Amino acid sequence: MIELDGQAGGGQLLRTALALSLCTGEAFAMTGIRAQRQRPGLLRQHLTAVEAARAVGDAIVDGANTGSTSLRFVPKGIRGGNHRWAIGTAGSTTLVLQTVLPALWMHGAEGSLTIEGGTHNPQAPTADFIDEAFLPLMKRMGLDGDFSMGGHGFYPAGGGEITFELRAGARPSALHLPHRGEVNERHARAILSAIPLGIAQRELDVVRRRLGLGEDEISVRQVKPPTGPGNALSIRVRAEHSTAVFTGFGIKRVTAEHVAEGASKAAQAWLAADVAVDEHLADQLLLPMALAGEGSFSTTLPSDHARSNAALIEKFLPVEFAFRDEGRGRWLVEVSR
């Protein structure tokens, strides 16, 4: 059994361990889960990920309780079929999906995965990011399936839903992304739920000015019926070899202009950098590339989160990661056996 210290990371460290355990069949025990957070231990959204992993892996689990700082997870085998999980809060649906999808894909399983909760959460990849940036690359690596969103879920109400219909396909294959190629599309979309339309107009005015977008490169999506008040601004930049999605979230006492400025600056920084993958997508590519046993991509300065995830992956899989500084803000991340 692999012994893990969860003090250095948050819930993502646990979710990555669950995903790796399912993929490899290796049991693990983690202590100190979220020990340095204001509310230590497992919260409801983490428990949903544990329950999803337990169901998919037919696993024996000890310590899956609210507030628990230790967990023991022993997978027995991968089970496809139809699964549905409800987080019950605005906790991220996409993080639960990413916990169980790699193992089902790797083991050639088929099934339907539906998760209810938050789809646009400031602390997690949005449903738009998964659909437009992450999954297209996974399909190039061999993933076969369809993603859909049955409803938007914003913090704090939640109420959203995502579904992934998985078909048995090829195991993960190597992907190399040294360059992004020419940018061929830019689009900004303001998403509103029970929020005045003027908020979207103010956000998009900033994006148009910052990024030089035309009228045909902006849109507004009003969620009907609304599941609760919420607002997100999603900027998509599609290039020849990769797509980046940058998101700003409307929150209390933060102006629409400030939300749009932050997302626009992130998009501008990526456009100015000579890299294929933005920082957030870089975090998401480590596990699937490790499962393929080979891969590489160029990105900006790797986050501490990416490095800690790479170190965790190396505990479960016979791979090594290399982070190479190529100068001028460009890094090359490589994984090999």
Give each language-model segment a name:
Residues 1-26:
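N-terminal basic/disordered segments at the start of proteins
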Residues 24-41, 110-113, 149:
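Glycine-rich phosphate/pyrophosphate-binding loops
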Residues 47-64, 68-146, 163:
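A generic, well-ordered mixed alpha/beta core segment in the N-terminal half of proteins
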Residues 298-337:
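C-terminal functional modules
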Residues 74, 78-80, 86-90, 106, ...:
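Phosphate/diphosphate-binding glycine-rich loops and adjacent basic-rich segments that engage nucleotide
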Residues 123, 140, 179-279, 296:
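Conserved mixed alpha/beta catalytic, RNA-binding, or beta-rich assembly cores of soluble enzyme
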Residues 60-64, 110-111, 144-152, 211-228, ...:
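Flexible, glycine/charged-enriched surface loops at secondary-structure junctions
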Residues 122-125, 149-163, 221-230:
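Beta-rich nucleic-acid/ligand-interaction surfaces
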